[in-house]
Amino acid sequence: MAPGIPAAMERPHFIGIGGAGMSGIAKILAQRGAKVAGSDAKESATAESLRALGATVHIGHAAGHLADDASCVVVSSAIRADNPELLRAGELAVPVVHRSDALASLMNGLRAIAVAGTHGKTTTTSMLAVALSSLGLAPSYAIGGDLEGPGTNATHGEGDIFVAEADESDRSFQKYDPEVAIVLNVELDHHANYASMDEIYDSFETFVGKIVPGGTLVVSADQPGAVELTRRVRDLSDLKVVTYGCAEDADVRVHKVTPRGLTSEVTVLLNGKFLTFTVSVPGAHYAHNAVAALAAGVALGIPAHNLASALGSYTGVKRRLQLKGEAAGVQVIDSYAHHPTEMTADLEAMRGAAADARILVVFQPHLFSRTQELGTEMGQALARADASVVLDIYPAREDPIPGITSALIIDAAKEAGAEVTAVHDQADVPAAVAGMAKSGDLVLTMGAGDVTDLGPRILDHLASGR
């Protein structure tokens, strides 16, 4: 039932094809039969998975990687103007398409669900994708992380539903025309692109305004930014607004979240009836993500009890409190949290799941601009751990900002009473953690950069007894 290949996407070339967002689009196009090619900075499991689908993936960036017959070049906001393949596209007059436009073209003609918000997008999108798949609806989906079960971040489904993570960081979420939009929260982040909360609200209002006539906005009734957004858009014509959360007036009210070890039991009140289901990750914030997914599915006309049962099929997404393993009695868990709100939520979730365990964090700040604006709050969040190791800032797409280092976070953490250590060389982290950890402890590798690679190395070091 799903559409075929958009004309401009028959022979696409992706610059940075290994990225979470780019690889998902490339996978769907390859599954639809497009001749996909691209390049990435380094070899990866993602590159191999794309090759398995028939894509050509080059390692490194060079003008010669771009085929003369490419129908378009797909880029994300992270690609610099001096990239040799992008310059070559200009010489060949090959159209350049932003990642968000490519995704929008794949969603055309389908019942789209776009999941937006400062935090929780990947988890909520994943929960929806798993639940809808479990119900036999064969959705297409594009997610910012790999699902634990299928082991992929995207797939082309034969059904008429497309679930997509909608990125607000560069305003690209304004390109979509969803039937259902989810807004989990609205906070100031991405400081290089937004100067104020007013700019954030304006951007989200534009996103909500793109919902198709008669469509539905599913929005948090608890988070202050989301509540303010609801106030601003509630009177838009031909828009249904469904709120969810603990607030007494929420349309889908969270009645109770009960921790059950590394899972949670969630009870909601919907249309005057109580409904209870299990979420296989700990923490109230993940329970609320599941309720948002439930509300979105109901907005599409799917029975709530079916969705509640199907949400139990969700087993997690990589890097979202993902258990990496255990050695010497120490569990190592990977967290993608990189904003103070996310950091606090994940630490509180782990504290609730394992109240007697010591929690040790290996934190890698993400982006100089974010550290400049939120470094103090990051340090305060780390005070919820029993001890922390803080690495140097992961720059991603940014150039350094003079005077902005991890010391901002470390100083704030110490001011808040935290036990914190700076480690500048990642090679020294496994030994540093082994020197701190004892049997029964939990170690969280936390951040949006390559800190995730340290989990297996920490486990190896612990197992060796060095």
UniProtKB/Swiss-Prot annotation:
Query: Which top-level group of life is the source organism from?
Result: Bacteria
Q: What is this protein called?
A: UDP-N-acetylmuramate--L-alanine ligase
Tell me where it resides. Answer: Cytoplasm
Q: Where is ATP bound in this sequence? A: G117, T118, H119, G120, K121, T122, T123
Q: Which keywords, in A-to-Z order, does the entry hold?
A: ATP-binding, Cell cycle, Cell division, Cell shape, Cell wall biogenesis/degradation, Cytoplasm, Ligase, Nucleotide-binding, Peptidoglycan synthesis
| Gene designation | murC
Which SUPFAM superfamilies does this UniProt record tie to the protein? MurCD N-terminal domain, MurD-like peptide ligases, catalytic domain, MurD-like peptide ligases, peptide-binding domain
Q: What class of enzyme is it?
A: ligase
E.C. number: 6.3.2.8
What this protein is reported to do is described as:
Cell wall formation.
Q: In which pathway does it act?
A: Cell wall biogenesis; peptidoglycan biosynthesis
Q: Which Pfam families match?
A: Mur_ligase, Mur_ligase_C, Mur_ligase_M
Some GO term, biological process aspect, for this entry: which one?
cell wall organization
Q: Which GO terms describe its molecular function?
A: ATP binding; UDP-N-acetylmuramate-L-alanine ligase activity
Q: Which reaction(s) does the protein catalyse, per the Swiss-Prot or TrEMBL entry? A: UDP-N-acetyl-alpha-D-muramate + L-alanine + ATP = UDP-N-acetyl-alpha-D-muramoyl-L-alanine + ADP + phosphate + H(+)
Q: Which InterPro entries match?
A: Mur-like_cat_sf (IPR036565), Mur_ligase_C (IPR004101), Mur_ligase_C_dom_sf (IPR036615), Mur_ligase_cen (IPR013221), Mur_ligase_N (IPR000713), MurCDEF_pg_biosynth (IPR050061), UDP-N-AcMur_Ala_ligase_MurC (IPR005758)
Task: Please give the family membership noted in the entry.
Answer: Belongs to the MurCDEF family.
Q: Residues of the signal sequence? A: none
Q: GO CC terms on record?
A: cytoplasm
